[in-house]
């Protein structure tokens, strides 16, 4: 049986993550408050950020930037700004 969480990003109930995907207190916060759907959305944004900004995950500053963007996206209802990207219209 999957667990349900109230997703802080989507502001609705949904299936929670199966396990903690990120270490530490932030990982626990994500596990307890973010749904699978919101996490999948974040992963797509994360890939775009890494590619467009040419981030190197071996570089501490780049990891910190990505973490800051993740917190902003998941918990502060922020959007990820990617230069030159226009989301498809619905």
From Swiss-Prot:
The processes (GO biological process) annotated in the record are: cellular response to oxidative stress
Entry keyword Transferase = no
TM segments?
Answer: none
Alphabetical list of PANTHER family matching this protein: FE(2+)-TRAFFICKING PROTEIN-RELATED
Family classification: Belongs to the Fe(2+)-trafficking protein family.
Q: What does this protein do?
A: Could be a mediator in iron transactions between iron acquisition and iron-requiring processes, such as synthesis and/or repair of Fe-S clusters in biosynthetic enzymes.
Q: What is this protein called?
A: Probable Fe(2+)-trafficking protein
Q: Which organism is it from?
A: Aeromonas hydrophila subsp. hydrophila (strain ATCC 7966 / DSM 30187 / BCRC 13018 / CCUG 14551 / JCM 1027 / KCTC 2358 / NCIMB 9240 / NCTC 8049)
